[in-house]
């Protein structure tokens, strides 16, 4: 996190994978189950009032992929960590449900 913070303060864009199981975070609903979810995006939003630009990869044939970049999701600094985290999980659920066969998890998110 320190490295992300250092780079962000220098004006770099940073990326986080929010679909990973974490040992620290908060429990937030993910496909109707409680799952520990990172609060790092919420912390950056609340501290720096930054935008979240959702990005994901989608297969378009057997060997090629497209990188999909969506419109920024904006939150106010006053939005709670819980709401930001839940809203990002909702976005992730919707994205997964578009093409569930393309989502790869090598871990149990709900453990």
What are these regions (language model features)?
Residues 2-111:
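Non-catalytic C-terminal accessory region of glycerolipid acyltransferases
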